[in-house]
């Protein structure tokens, strides 16, 4: 047994190391522990033991150099005076050399001493401990002992060693707490001795034991030391399992505890094994014993093992032996497997039956017909054994003395064989012969066969005996007519005293009552016929017609041979006719009967003699004599008048024995085998029981046997005596009739060979069985409280305690039959079988019940309920109650569940009642969301219950596992109800009316979704704007599709799988998108595209970009297809050269998580590259992305068209100012390209639409710089609500042309009732951008990548704030904004346009949009060029050095060279730096350091480069794209479509001339009608610039000319201006107010009219002089009028356009300053406002009227007396 023993804790290190780095190596010597320190090997401790006072003890410390170099060291002496060594001196040790240092110990007192010697080396110090200790006891043993797991009530043990490591002999004693014990508990250990101690763990309960054992040791002074004992005890759990075939009725998958042997041949034994399984983690000792049962039972089941140990988690094979003894007996027995402690019992049931031979005769009679005297006849008799058990058979006939003989009268009939026997008929007299011969079979009832035949002679010819005569004879015997001879029967038949039935058998006249039928012959059992012969027993089936006495006789010892006395034999005729007895002569036999034949009158007897004539001494003699008695009238057939009166003869037999052994001569020793059972088969009281015995003669001599029937009269044996030939056998049948149930022993003496010394006592036991049924629980059955209307089933066991099969029947009172039922109600219990019955109790009221049931039991043969049966009462106690079920959580939300995936939860059902409840659960499903109700109503149930029905015990809970699997991306609601399962509600279909709501479960089916949140480009695609990039990659369509539900074909492979066998995998996705990387010249930098993937769903998503090679399965080379298509070759070239790459190619995103993915296209080969890449989201979408990239030759003119079809924004019909729309062209080449739009098709469309210009191209020609995007402006003006198409050729000068289809849609706003098109400036997916996406090497980022101004009125200003953030930690950046076109410069303003951003800093940039007066759809790409400031500074230095070198070389070339002009011209800078004019120093940049595909711009050859420096190139900027979108509307359109938004914008008030010029209708009409306007719109930049400069000069001159201003002013002051009729109404009113306001200006010219002093003076004068009241009131009125005039003037000023523009600018600058300060943290916009309490106002008179000046910010109070105001004054005030 294994145990874990933990050693002593390590002692403190005796060596005190003074520095780190020393490596100590333990020595292999046990006597002295050594260590190695920097190559010096030395003992760690020197210890002195057994020292005495006054003596010096010397020990030597050895130092050895184990290093390969010479070691030098020194040491210091011990610090105390008790340890002395030699004076310190330097030590040098060569490799392998040793030094011995003596240490002297001088003690002065008895105590412990400790010191050390310190050694110094260059590497550090180490010390050796010197210790001297007193003699003391010390024991060494482990600190802790772990014992193995142990079963409760079992024991486990382990051992450990206790060693005396002290200096004294010591005693020890253990104190161990329970359940541990030590052996030995105490002892004595001498110095250095050790002993083994055993720890025994005997737990009584399951627990983890962790105790402390104490060891006391020492002689004078007791010391103790503790040990920790750890062990764990567990309860064993044993189960029995029968391997192999399952028992009938057993549930599959469960352990079988019934061992079925089946049918086993009698006398044989069969072994089968069962497994005892130990389900626990501990070894389980157990006992195997037989269940307690009566002692009378024969133990046909046996097991040799009574105690065993089953290993933990293992099994034990147990062999059970079955050896049945009685044929047809069904055996049942039980073994119990009980673990130690009787904690649990496991019962093993064993069943088996005994089978024997099944022998039958093919015919019941053998008819020899008739033969002549002296002849013989042979017939065949077949005997078969249909069983597989061998059968011993014997025909009870002696062929030597009978007219009938068999060739094999006895033998063994093997299983399933048939034997053909020859029966020979040799008659000795001319008479009829009939003998009924019994065939005895061991372990089977006897068989009977009739031998009959007729012998004729010349003188005697009796009637021929036939089979019908035997049948008539048996019927006549029953009717009592066979005692009359045939002649008398014939007379009675003639006289009518006898009749014949339908079978022609004789019968007497019918008796009263007439309906009583005549008696018929019925076959008796073979055993009854065999034993009830009137000879072996006193009973007989029928009275004998002829009897002979004696039937058996033993002549005894007949010596000398001539003195054998004859045996008198008496034959009696019991019939009423004269009979003749003829004996069959036995030729060669020592026994003869005289006379051979004799007639016997009716009812008379006749005497015969049996003579015994032996021929030799010391021999055994035995024989059977045969004779036939018949009616004398049957000797001649002519005497028979009626065939039905023929009566067969009766056979008489006599068994004779004798021997001629002399008196002192020992008889022959018999050699035999006796097979006899130990007990009689069980029967009921006063019933016959039978068994057979087999006596086999295994010797070479005949054996005679005799059973002393008188010695045991209670047992009948047949035959009583006889003989057995050598090799033969004799079958006995024994019978007894037990009366009581007390076991009775029977002893039968069997004497062999007529010698008392050869007597074998056969001991048999018999016992009558009485009905005994064992009821479980003393006949009481308790039911737990049961819910009304429901049923409770309880198991109740009854056991047959007898050895006979017992039938039972339960009777329940009729009134209780509705409440109580049992299954099965009747049945058969095999011997000692226990049956568990199912009792069902169904209460119907809330009450307690006391019911009674009766079981009637009886034997199997009669009816169970009969006078012979008995009954037992069973009391049933139960209670009816009410109960309900509730859910612990009435509402459960499972949240989001992946569509097609499983999610489960536990639904807890609570039963708070006192009764168990059987329930049935039902589920109703409700699907809500954006779906078709008719389509989803047919969906299968997406919720599955682990079990829909079950039982909850009282006051307990049940867990139901709920699994949901949504099939759609919708919201699911399941309402779960329950119904109590009752006989009225047996299943779910019957529960509709009994439903009770239980709980509600919700879940939402979701698909894993991702979307592209942002995209940016770099490398050769850095010039592509974000909006164009978004369209090139079809990201709108991709995002839109990613939000849909995946198609079933997309879920063919739910996760990325290698499923294709070809290079081009099959396509299962319904969507294919183009991922266009644009175009670039060959050798350019790779086009980089950064995509930001966002998991916008609620479940994690795994995504992957799968190239065709990622979808192909790995196959052997021979399986590959060698014939590749051009498409496959193209894809292989792309993948092999890695022209397209994705990094990372896969990942996993949690909800809300983002990840950047880099896509690249390398421009290594000229042409168009295509590669299908599958974007796969596990359990979601898979979309085929066609990667496409174009590589062109250098200097090739190439314009990349995003698509061949362009959709213009839909325009409402009747729109007076249709917006300008743009079509983008991207120049993917390296040179500037010119394009021209062919307008012929546009003219045709205009002609088809009544000369209405549906399509107007504003930029029919233009140029596009390399790597930039050009715009073609269009105006779409529909005439009807329909779709317009036009195919427009676009020619690229020096390049390819393209035919682009422009499609526009006109709609009727009145019909649609909405203006949605106005509101859809950009799609929502485009608006949502992320600023977290950066390209490699990006040093700055924008706070927004896209700005949408939305819909704005024309000529208004709108501003947005964007922050430029420097994400670098230590480098400042320089930025410069640039726009894409002249038009963008006109409408967009950026402040600041350039600047420097410090590390980790940010700069606010204000983007202001002011439409230029033409309604347009604005889509501008603002590019922020960002440089690292250090790189610019370095570039400036390099450029300055290069310029100085250039000047120096120019001088040198002027003197020495003739081509200086060309060189100078060649080295001129080709670019102009806008801000920084200096260049960095000249450096020779090797090609290896340049990026891949970089276009080298060296201007000198390699030869010239050695003399002239190459001009340094400016650093490449980082391009940050800012997309600005907006749509401008005319004021009228904006007001009509966006009324609520109109007040948010400031509309500048232009002059009359401006209004007339900018009027949209006039301007648009002029554009449409004047052809020259179109040519002006298509003018070049230079032409437009000239016109602009001229107009600016003219306008500036007019604004500066004062004479012009005066002339305009004078014209406005004319009485009736000529053009006043054209002015607006509001202008006229304003001018009228202005004229009116000038009237009282002279009156208001007094400067002191409204001073405070004058006001106070007038007030005091009013109080002092009443005569001045009227004058004061008029003065107050004039003051009010003057204030009104001032207010009117200020209002006029506010209405001026200049004033509004000024206020707008002030407000705009104020808000911008606030935002800038807030971004710097100076202002907190979200802080709570502070409230300052103002002081209270002083009290003023209520008579004072408060009025406020309109148009100013002051508040004045004017005193007024209402009584002094006249009506005229009031009217003036009101005016």
UniProtKB/Swiss-Prot annotation:
Transmembrane segments: 84-104
Keyword check for Cytoplasm: yes
Gene3D superfamilies: Immunoglobulins
InterPro entries (alphabetical): ASH (IPR031549), CFAP65 (IPR052614), HYDIN_VesB_CFA65-like_Ig (IPR053879), Ig-like_fold (IPR013783), Ig_CFAP65_10th (IPR056305)
Presence of the UniProt keyword Transmembrane in the record: yes
Biased composition regions of type Polar residues, renumbered to the chain: 1633-1645
Domain of life: Eukaryota
Official protein name in the record: Cilia- and flagella-associated protein 65
Organism: Gallus gallus
Gene name, Swiss-Prot/TrEMBL: CFAP65
